[in-house]
């Protein structure tokens, strides 16, 4: 089972990716996680990526493609994988096809921008563990502190409102041709589904299971 999961930041993509990974036993490949890992290594590539992200811009196709190519040739992807947030441009989609990276299903999570902004702004992260909090929806027990370790929480640059709005504009511009591309991909035996994600997590889980079986 080879799946692409697409959706704007804050659409619930990460939560659903974890659900799919556990239920169907395939690895979750997140381009966001790979990029953050590269940034944390403080290499030249990591510093370049960090500068791009701080401006709220998307990382260039070629950089992301190279990271994904290295990941999907690993053994745990031999029986399937879940690509989270990739491809996000036509160049990336074409590069996947040229490289012989075939997928079976594309899931696109759709949710209004206003709701996405409310979800993301106010989000806080415990970087060592990846635990995520929100000042309104999931506040920590102690303000600004991780519940488990008591360590400080941070607000990522890409979770600030101006950055989120800028990213959403870029996301929509990129997604229109991507959606068209995969909706017309029936000749390559790719099934594409757009799912209303403005619903409780359990409801969204059920919608996805009905599609994947």
From Swiss-Prot:
Record key words, sorted: ATP-binding, Cytoplasm, Kinase, Nucleotide biosynthesis, Nucleotide-binding, Transferase
Keyword Nucleotide-binding among record annotations: yes
Residues reported to bind AMP: 31, 36, 57-59, 85-88, 92, 156, 167
InterPro entries assigned: Adenyl_kin_sub (IPR006259), Adenylat/UMP-CMP_kin (IPR000850), Adenylat_kinase_CS (IPR033690), Adenylate_kinase_lid-dom (IPR007862), P-loop_NTPase (IPR027417)
Renumbered residue ranges of the record's region LID: 122-159
Subcellular location: Cytoplasm
Biological processes per GO annotation: AMP salvage
Any one GO molecular-function label of the UniProt entry: ATP binding
GO cellular component: cytoplasm
Region (NMP): 30-59
Enzyme Commission no: 2.7.4.3
Tree of life domain: Bacteria
Residues that bind ATP: 10-15, 123, 132-133, 199
Reaction it catalyzes: AMP + ATP = 2 ADP
Metabolic or biological pathway: Purine metabolism; AMP biosynthesis via salvage pathway; AMP from ADP: step 1/1
Record has Electron transport as a keyword: no
Family designation: Belongs to the adenylate kinase family.
Domain notes: Consists of three domains, a large central CORE domain and two small peripheral domains, NMPbind and LID, which undergo movements during catalysis. The LID domain closes over the site of phosphoryl transfer upon ATP binding. Assembling and dissambling the active center during each catalytic cycle provides an effective means to prevent ATP hydrolysis.
Role according to the record: Catalyzes the reversible transfer of the terminal phosphate group between ATP and AMP. Plays an important role in cellular energy homeostasis and in adenine nucleotide metabolism.
PANTHER family from the UniProt entry: NUCLEOTIDE KINASE
Quaternary structure note: Monomer.
HAMAP family per UniProt: Adenylate_kinase_Adk
Protein name: Adenylate kinase
Organism: Baumannia cicadellinicola subsp. Homalodisca coagulata
């Amino acid at each position: 089972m080879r799946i692409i999961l697409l959706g704007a930041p804050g659409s619930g993509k990460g939560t659903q990716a974890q659900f799919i990974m556990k239920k169907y036993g395939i690895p979750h490949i997140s381009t966001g996680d790979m990029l953050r890992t590269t940034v944390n290594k403080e290499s030249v590539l990591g510093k370049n990526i960090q500068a791009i992200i701080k401006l709220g811009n998307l990382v260039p196709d070629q950089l992301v493609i190279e990271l994904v190519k290295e990941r999907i040739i690993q053994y745990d992807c031999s029986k399937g994988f879940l690509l989270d947030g990739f491809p996000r441009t036509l160049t990336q989609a074409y590069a996947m096809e040229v490289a012989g990276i075939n997928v079976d299903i594309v899931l696109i999570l759709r949710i209004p921008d206003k709701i996405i902004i409310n979800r993301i702004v106010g989000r806080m992260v415990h970087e060592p563990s990846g635990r995520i909090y929100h000042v309104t929806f999931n506040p920590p027990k102690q303000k600004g502190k991780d519940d488990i370790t008591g360590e400080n929480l941070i607000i990522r640059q890409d979770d600030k409102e101006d950055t989120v709005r800028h990213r959403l504009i870029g996301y929509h511009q990129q997604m229109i041709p991507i959606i068209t591309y995969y909706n017309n991909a029936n000749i390559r035996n790719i099934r594409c589904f757009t799912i209303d994600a403005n619903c409780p997590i359990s409801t969204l889980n059920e919608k996805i299971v009905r599609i994947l079986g």
